[in-house]
């Protein structure tokens, strides 16, 4: 599958007046005009570097640590709500943004994102994308009498949407081109910000197979917008062993607000199962076994959930009698306040510390970070999508069968959808009520 990347930087004035103009801009780097309805793509001079999977180690570790921090903050906002987010999408968008940061802003971004080696992180993110690309496979065994098409599709897309006739640093464009495969789409926010918004949303809609049709709401772009970074992730994967839908039954689920009825899928299979202090976990593989869905559930609602590495480290093969609810949930949120609380405040201040992006004055800073994600889990497998926009603004063998472990997921649970080769958490979340649909 061809990998497309897309990075977009927009200003969102509709959110807490974060989008205010820094002043008049004068283009000093020649970016040819492009209408928002038919944007012109400008690539950096550097060719895309082919990274290898081993480059992904640092990126994977950083994303998983960032994921744990962010998960805790997001759950605390509304402990009884369903939650899904993509730490990979958010980290990719913010790491691309950090490529243009300097000074305290860069230091804080690296700390929050758990980037310990800034000099190599962009190559590592490139390697992570290469690892994700490698899981894309489709096999149709219908002709051989099999069940049909087995598929894993995982696409990562990034790009940059910039104001035409505005100065952007060549080194910044080259880095995004070589490590992220990202070109800049030139639009004209000054004369038609709404057309730019429509174009960006159309791109996200296409990349996510219509699962996220409107990342940016009405009025989110203004004449003061100069640049918007956008990442989009789409995933569709069949289970290695599909659930028999004839065995799906309406069963009780203990949600925070009281008992609800969930459509519970059932199977008995050899799975990776583990236990810890007050919690149990099971890992359900997708076809080809490159990706997995890891579920952790507490013995009671007040038990602290393990970190993903702790849960994964406790796993061992067991025969499991599994009950897992079908669910279809989504989350749409601004991450600005959360990221500030996590220690990334300088990036949201008018400090002129994104000079790696542009030498234009007044300088740019982050106005907002918008994230949407959704996930659908059923008998066949999983379909999920996520998108993140970082909005830059101006100052403005045959043997005796063992006794199966019974694991019925009938109360709130945490999940991680992981790339098994790198351990990277692609999607994570918390299901408190599987009967609530998006």
Positions of the model-derived regions?
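Extracytoplasmic/secreted cell-surface and envelope-processing proteins
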Residues: 104-109, 303, 331-333, 424-428, ...
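C-terminal soluble interaction/assembly domains
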Residues: 379-438
């Amino acid at each position: 599958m061809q990998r497309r990347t897309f990075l977009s930087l927009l200003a969102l004035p509709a959110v807490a007046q974060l989008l205010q103009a820094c002043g008049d801009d004068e283009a000093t780097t020649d970016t040819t005009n492009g209408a928002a309805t038919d944007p012109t793509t400008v690539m950096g001079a550097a060719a895309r570097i082919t990274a290898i999977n081993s480059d992904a180690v640092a990126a994977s570790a950083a994303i998983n640590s960032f994921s744990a921090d962010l998960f805790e903050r997001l759950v605390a906002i509304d402990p009884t709500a369903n939650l899904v987010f993509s730490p990979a999408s958010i980290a990719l968008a913010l790491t691309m943004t950090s490529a243009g940061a300097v000074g305290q802003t860069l230091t804080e971004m690296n700390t929050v994102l758990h980037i310990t080696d800034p000099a190599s992180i962009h190559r590592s993110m490139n390697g992570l994308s290469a690892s994700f690309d490698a899981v894309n496979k489709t096999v149709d065994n219908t002709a051989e009498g099999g069940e049909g098409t087995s598929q894993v599709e995982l696409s990562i897309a990034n790009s940059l949407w910039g104001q035409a006739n505005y100065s952007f640093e060549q080194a910044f464009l080259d880095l995004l081109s070589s490590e992220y495969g990202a070109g800049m789409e030139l639009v004209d926010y000054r004369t038609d910000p709404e057309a730019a918004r429509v174009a960006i949303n159309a791109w996200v809609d296409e990349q996510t197979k219509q699962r996220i049709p409107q990342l940016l709401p009405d009025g989110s772009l203004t004449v003061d917008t100069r640049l918007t970074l956008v990442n989009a992730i789409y995933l569709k994967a069949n289970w290695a062993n599909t659930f028999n839908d004839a065995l799906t039954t309406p069963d009780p689920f203990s949600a925070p607000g009281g008992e609800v009825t969930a459509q519970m899928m059932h199977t008995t299979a050899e799975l990776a199962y583990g236990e810890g202090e007050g919690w149990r976990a099971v890992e359900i593989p997708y076809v080809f076994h490159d990706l997995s869905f890891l579920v952790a559930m507490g013995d009671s609602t007040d038990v602290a959930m393990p970190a993903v590495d702790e849960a994964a480290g406790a796993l061992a093969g067991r025969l499991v009698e599994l009950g897992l609810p079908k669910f279809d949930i989504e989350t749409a949120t601004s991450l600005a306040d959360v990221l500030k609380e996590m220690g990334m405040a300088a990036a949201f201040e008018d400090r002129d510390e994104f000079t790696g992006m542009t030498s234009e004055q007044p300088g740019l800073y982050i106005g907002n970070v918008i994230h949407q994600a959704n996930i659908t889990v059923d008998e066949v497998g999983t379909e999920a999508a996520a998108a993140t926009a970082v909005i830059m603004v101006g100052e403005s063998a045959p043997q005796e069968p063992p006794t199966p472990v019974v694991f019925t997921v009938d109360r709130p649970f945490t999940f991680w959808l992981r790339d098994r080769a790198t351990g990277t958490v692609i999607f994570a979340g918390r299901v408190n009520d599987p009967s609530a649909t998006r």
